[in-house]
Amino acid sequence: MIPFLDLRQINMRYQKEIQQAMNRVLESGWYILGGEVDDFERKFASYCGAKYCIGVANGLDALTLIIRAYDIGLGDEVIVPSNTYIASILAISANGATPVLVEPDINTYNIDPLKIEEKITSRTKAIMVVHLYGQSCDMESINLIAKKYNLKVIEDCAQAHGAIYNGKRVGSLGDAAGFSFYPGKNLGALGDGGAITTNDAELAERLNVLRNYGSHKKYENLFKGVNSRLDELQAAILSIKLSYLDDDNQRRREIAAYYLEHIKNPFIHLPTVTDDKAHVWHLFVVRVKEREAFQYYLAEQNIQTLIHYPIPPHKQKAYSEWQQESFPISEQIHSEVVSLPISPVMSREEVERVVEAVNRYGY
């Protein structure tokens, strides 16, 4: 079986370094908000081209805290793509604000800048962009719209660690950005983790306080904060894996390039790439009309596939108020997408087997 993602194989490459780091943290006697977190925050901010990084417990918290730090809440609206993972939308709802869904570009799957402006009202406070599957959104167009209406731009970078747009890495393209370090991400922890990057000193200071019960000094609380802190063990592991991220992303690009060149099947719609050197290919997503049959066929060929994502947000029971709304592009995407295996530890033989199997489908 060719697995969709072999996390054991990915992480065993760093076994010695990780065990040394874990021993170092264990022996330090300090496990929350210590030197390892400080070190990772410095490294990751520098990597992203941002001035500040604030480590938090997970990617959802990262987005939720950004919105909270901007005092966006009840009565406010936030523009967000209609085909994102639900966490992007939950972060808005958690603050009492209203998510306003905007359809994606059918080719890139990212939010369509041409459809944003018509959804802006006097209540709109921010645009949340999601760099879906590893490819940056059209940030030049989006930032121009945000500037015109005096809106904040929040990046959801959960699937795009290291992706580049016009020479700059995601995480430095808007006002603030949220990252997830869920184990399956391009930069994944051995558990949950997240981070926020920004160039705004005042925002960074407030986020540092909000993530720690709203406390700027022990037992003194400026805000009604939360407990959302990246722990020392995960920070130490992430520092190790960050040093290999560019190499891993390059291997993903090589596999994606092979897929794009060699998959030739009229039943398979391949992804559209705006810049092949900037995409980090968190996922390689194709579209197939008869998705269930395609997945069943590949499973019989011992190839694991996944769906990202089967149900669009407006069809989720949690958001029943949207059930009657129509988002035809999102609905088409969610009914057809299939993610093929892609990871930095896939062998050439495995990649070739995937291509051969996909090319035989339907014949």
From Swiss-Prot:
State the CDD domains in the record.
Answer: AHBA_syn
What's the family? Belongs to the DegT/DnrJ/EryC1 family.
Q: Which residues form a coiled coil?
A: none
Reaction(s) catalysed (UniProt annotation): dTDP-3-amino-3,6-dideoxy-alpha-D-galactopyranose + 2-oxoglutarate = dTDP-3-dehydro-6-deoxy-alpha-D-galactose + L-glutamate
Superkingdom of the source?
Answer: Bacteria
Keywords assigned by UniProt, alphabetized: Pyridoxal phosphate, Transferase
Question: What is the protein's name according to its record?
Answer: dTDP-3-amino-3,6-dideoxy-alpha-D-galactopyranose transaminase
The answer to whether keyword Transferase applies is yes
Q: Cross-referenced PANTHER family, in alphabetical order?
A: 3-OXO-GLUCOSE-6-PHOSPHATE:GLUTAMATE AMINOTRANSFERASE (PTHR30244:SF36), TRANSAMINASE (PTHR30244)
Q: Which GO terms describe its molecular function?
A: pyridoxal phosphate binding; transaminase activity
Instruction: Give the protein's biological function.
Output: Specifically aminates dTDP-6-deoxy-D-xylohex-3-ulose to form dTDP-D-Fucp3N in the biosynthesis of dTDP-3-acetamido-3,6-dideoxy-alpha-D-galactose, a glycan chain of the S-layer.
GO terms in the biological process aspect are:
polysaccharide biosynthetic process
Q: Which Pfam families match?
A: DegT_DnrJ_EryC1
Source organism of this protein record: Aneurinibacillus thermoaerophilus
InterPro entries, per the entry = DegT/StrS_aminotransferase (IPR000653), PyrdxlP-dep_Trfase (IPR015424), PyrdxlP-dep_Trfase_major (IPR015421), PyrdxlP-dep_Trfase_small (IPR015422)
So which cofactors does this thing need? pyridoxal 5'-phosphate
List the EC numbers from the record.
Answer: 2.6.1.90
What are the N6-(pyridoxal phosphate)lysine sites (modified residues) in this protein? 185
